[in-house]
């Protein structure tokens, strides 16, 4: 399902920003929304409901940093979403510096991957906040890959309530 706008409640933004500031390492989070209507159709708005911070283990190597989330944890989140009639529609994670380009590892380890999903990469381990309109890169999942939004598109489509 593709949306025109993603409406982000203050509680979801604050919980995400807090999770990102917990340590000087990469952190991953998921935003959920209610399951509504035709999953192949388009809806005007996604009303985000929750920030889910999975149990995760940070890693570092000469090639970069990452977090690993066990399959059982991802299954737990999906079952919880099912019980709540929600769906994971946005994945977010931090990068150590200002470079928020989507890496090949980001593509290989995508968690939320349906068409219309978002992947948001926040700079500096979230030290400056989420920076959704002026620092983070926002990507939208298309059939074959992720499409980078412009800063203008992010400002118009990500609505902080």
Question: What is each of the regions a protein language model found here?
Answer:
Residues 1-88, 97-161:
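Conserved beta-strand-loop surface patch within small alpha/beta domains used
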Residues 94:
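Histidine-centered nuclease catalytic patch
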């Amino acid at each position: 399902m593709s949306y025109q706008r993603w409406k982000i409640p203050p509680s979801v933004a604050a919980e995400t920003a807090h999770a990102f500031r917990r340590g000087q390492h990469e952190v991953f989070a998921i935003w959920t929304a209610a399951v509504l209507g035709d999953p192949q159709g388009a809806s005007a708005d996604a009303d985000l409901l929750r920030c889910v911070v999975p149990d995760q283990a940070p890693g570092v190597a000469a090639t970069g940093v990452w977090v690993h989330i066990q399959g059982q944890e991802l299954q737990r989140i999906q079952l919880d979403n099912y019980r709540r009639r929600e769906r994971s529609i946005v994945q977010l994670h931090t990068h150590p510096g200002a470079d928020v380009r989507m890496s090949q590892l980001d593509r290989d380890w995508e968690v939320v991957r349906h068409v219309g999903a978002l992947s948001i990469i926040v700079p500096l381990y979230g030290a400056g906040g989420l920076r959704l309109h002026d620092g983070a890169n926002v990507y939208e999942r298309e059939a074959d890959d992720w499409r980078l939004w412009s800063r203008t598109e992010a400002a118009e489509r990500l609505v902080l309530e």
